[in-house]
A protein has these predicted regions:
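Sec-dependent N-terminal signal peptides
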Residues: 6-8
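Interaction-mediating elements
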Residues: 18-258
Length: 258
């Protein structure tokens, strides 16, 4: 009996091993993403994390989770009554040979198995234009936050056979922007004195490439500096911060007002 069950399960599993089984007629299954930065294949793992859509998870080179999902069917009945209506011959056969209790038990088992496949499997990742647009926005914001204010990001869909496609992202970073003068305007002499005493520890230094992360670190550093010296109610919101030149000139430098 055990061998028969295993054979039955394998037959079902192999019959589901079409990755496009649940892909609509006008849909495309995401096979792969590619990212090219300045005409070179991307090696920055941070960019991969910005992809809104990623292909179905693979195990041993196969999208097993997708295959499991394909064994299920969202349109199958979810109650014994629905199951009996859609599968009257099977329901009545078991009822007549054994009992209605066995028919109900069998129906519940089939419903539970179907739901298990849907819950533990992974639905096919269908390419969506709005998610590609969101990815482009993510990639653009990432580079601007790292000083590439003139970055250009584009996408293209490479359609392949069997309802599959590759989404290609192309990024032209442009030249980075560097920090020029760091200007402070601290009206309180006490606060100014504290700031100047540890200015050498600043995360913002002339000549460094603009990085949003360094501004966040600097805001935290100044806040902790003041709080550790008795200015307990000082917050990052009290900083007149991020007064960065809005018009980046051809020199690719920007002043920072603090």
């Amino acid at each position: 009996m055990k061998k028969i069950f295993i054979l039955f399960f394998l037959t079902l599993f192999l019959s589901s091993c079409s990755s496009i089984k649940r892909v609509g007629e006008d849909d495309l299954l995401l096979k792969q993403n590619t990212i090219v930065v300045d005409e070179k294949k991307n090696t920055n793992s941070d960019l991969n994390e910005l992809l809104v859509q990623k292909p179905n998870i693979k195990t041993l080179g196969l999208p097993l989770s997708l295959y499991f999902y394909n064994l299920g069917d969202k349109n199958k009945p979810n109650t014994v009554n629905e199951w009996g209506i859609k599968k009257p011959k099977t329901y009545n056969f078991i009822k007549n040979i054994f009992s209605e209790k066995q028919s109900i038990s069998y129906a519940n088992s089939m419903i539970g198995l179907n739901n298990w496949f849907l819950k533990n499997g992974q639905a096919p990742v269908i390419i969506k234009d709005e998610k590609i647009t969101k990815t482009i926005s993510n990639l653009t914001a990432y580079h601007k936050n790292n000083g590439y204010f003139r970055v250009k990001a584009q996408s293209s869909i490479e359609v392949q056979k069997n309802k599959k496609a590759i989404v290609n992202y192309t990024i032209d970073k442009g030249r980075p922007t560097f920090l020029d003068s760091i200007i402070t305007n601290i009206k309180s002499s006490v606060l100014d004195s504290l700031y100047q005493s540890q200015k050498s520890l600043s995360f913002l230094k002339k000549g460094d490439q603009f990085k949003e992360a360094n501004f966040i670190k600097e805001a935290s550093r100044i806040t902790n500096l003041y709080r550790n010296n008795g200015i307990y109610h000082f917050t990052e919101n009290d900083l007149g911060y991020y007064n960065i030149d809005s018009a980046i000139t051809n020199s690719y430098k920007t002043n920072v007002d603090l």
